[in-house]
């Protein structure tokens, strides 16, 4: 099992798709990392040699990408800053509402939580 940046990569996936399990690496950046590290894109995680894993580690360390904990901390601090300056986006984050202008009269259930049932009036 290959472990990079504190993440266990899945064993039987191709290395480009396995790298996407690291927070902050998408498929495009994974392919660039593999190209820089001179690894065959068809290689599965199980078949990586120790030299290839070392090359991957060095490539990730030398890249200017924010990964895993650093990226999560960076995003958390940005949201915290928005809350502190009391801007519209900060208020939306604080109230667990959609931030980017989506409608909330209907839909937005994934952001607002499960449906709240309202009982009708009894006569």
Swiss-Prot record:
**Which residue intervals are annotated with compositional bias (Basic residues) in the record?**
102-123
Signal peptide as annotated in the record: none
The record's annotation in Gene3D superfamilies points to: 1.10.8.50, 30s ribosomal protein s13, domain 2
Annotated compartments: Plastid, Chloroplast
Q: Which GO terms describe its cellular component?
A: chloroplast; mitochondrion; small ribosomal subunit
GO MF term (any one): rRNA binding
Where's it mainly located? plastid
Pfam families linked? Ribosomal_S13
Keyword line:
Chloroplast, Plastid, Ribonucleoprotein, Ribosomal protein, RNA-binding, rRNA-binding
Provide the GO biological process annotations: translation
Segments for region (Disordered): 89-123
Q: Which InterPro entries match?
A: Rbsml_uS13_C (IPR027437), Ribosomal_uS13 (IPR001892), Ribosomal_uS13-like_H2TH (IPR010979), Ribosomal_uS13_bac-type (IPR019980), Ribosomal_uS13_CS (IPR018269)
Q: Which PROSITE patterns match?
A: RIBOSOMAL_S13_1 (PS00646), RIBOSOMAL_S13_2 (PS50159)
PANTHER family, alphabetized: 30S RIBOSOMAL PROTEIN S13/40S RIBOSOMAL PROTEIN S18 (PTHR10871), SMALL RIBOSOMAL SUBUNIT PROTEIN US13M (PTHR10871:SF1)
Q: Which family does it belong to?
A: Belongs to the universal ribosomal protein uS13 family.
Describe its assembly: Part of the 30S ribosomal subunit.
- What does this protein's UniProt record list under function? Located at the top of the head of the 30S subunit, it contacts several helices of the 16S rRNA.
Its protein name is Small ribosomal subunit protein uS13c
Give the source lineage, highest ranks first. Eukaryota, Sar, Stramenopiles, Ochrophyta, Bacillariophyta
């Amino acid at each position: 099992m290959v472990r990079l940046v504190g993440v266990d990569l899945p064993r039987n996936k191709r290395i480009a798709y396995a790298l996407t399990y690291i927070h902050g690496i998408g498929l495009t950046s994974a392919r660039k990392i593999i190209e820089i590290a001179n690894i065959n894109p068809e290689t599965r995680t199980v078949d990586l040699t120790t030299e290839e894993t070392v090359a991957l580690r060095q490539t990730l360390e030398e890249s200017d990408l924010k990964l895993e904990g650093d990226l999560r901390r960076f995003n958390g601090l940005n949201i915290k800053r928005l809350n502190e300056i009391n801007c519209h986006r900060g208020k939306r984050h604080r109230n667990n509402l959609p931030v980017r202008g989506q409608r909330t009269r209907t839909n937005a259930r994934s952001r607002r939580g499960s449906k709240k049932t309202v009982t009708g009036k009894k006569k």
